Amino acid sequence: MLSFIFLVFAVIHFGIWLWGWKLWAETGRPVALLVVLIGSTLLFYDNLRIGMGRFIGEGDLLYALSVPAFAWHWSLLPLLVIAAGSVARLAGLPWAQHKLVMGAFCVVAVVLSAIDIPKIFAMELHLACLDDTVRYTTTVREAQLCSPTDQVISSNDFPIVAILTNVIVLGVGIALWIQRRWAWLAVGSGLMFVAAGALGQGRYALPISNLGEICITLGFIVTCAHYARLKQRSAGNVPQPIGAPTGAIEKGRA
């Protein structure tokens, strides 16, 4: 059953990703949305390899399929920091219009990438099982042991990059909520924060966290497309509807 849930997550992520590219083309190809889409390219793949693990089984093939998922996560996750700064700029937030501010977002992203990228070259994955799922991962809890002879694999590696990235995106989302009355990014990143934090410590931490990734990705895509459309309208070039609600949460406009 859990494998099926991850396969559903994979389909949802792929659908969201394709929809995002459609919105990107329709709304003037905003840089903010481009960065989000590049950063989220392999979210569907990460869920797919977990969902398919039970069918592939333990071995070199599943291990090899797992490596790109971790390499992608460690190298491209900080792109969301740049996306957060870009969407703040796109939304017309005064403090985000300064080049130094956008430069600061980029510097933070580079620093965070520099923290995580070395992990790619020291990657060591271990077999883990949960319900009917079979996957390779960096740490293995007692509840994820595949056999009585397997050992718990712990790590002192604190996910500082993921936490700081989420906090920065949430901060921009809250700023948009307060200054522009647009809550989608705050809600999406807030759900991601809760899913990976308060709800991400139990037996089913992984599927809950991956559900949070759907929320933050949706929040980013809808927000980027919304403000790109407003920018086109202000320039007198009104695009076709993007298929996302524009008034349910937002009561004002940029």
Give the ranges of each region predicted by the language model.
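Hydrophobic transmembrane alpha-helical segments in integral membrane proteins
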Residues: 1-16
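Internal transmembrane alpha-helix with an interfacial aromatic "cap," most often the third helix
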Residues: 14-24, 41, 49-61, 71-105, ...
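Membrane-interfacial loop-to-transmembrane alpha-helix junctions, especially the N-terminal start
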Residues: 27-40, 96-104, 178-189
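Aromatic-anchored segments of alpha-helical transmembrane domains
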Residues: 41-48, 108-118, 189-202
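Membrane-interface interhelical loops and short amphipathic "cap" helices
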Residues: 51-67, 126-140
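Non-cytosolic membrane-interface motifs at loop->transmembrane helix junctions
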Residues: 59-71, 132, 205-215
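C-terminal transmembrane-bundle signature of multipass membrane proteins
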Residues: 77, 167-253
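Membrane-proximal helix-loop-helix units in multi-pass membrane proteins
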Residues: 85-166
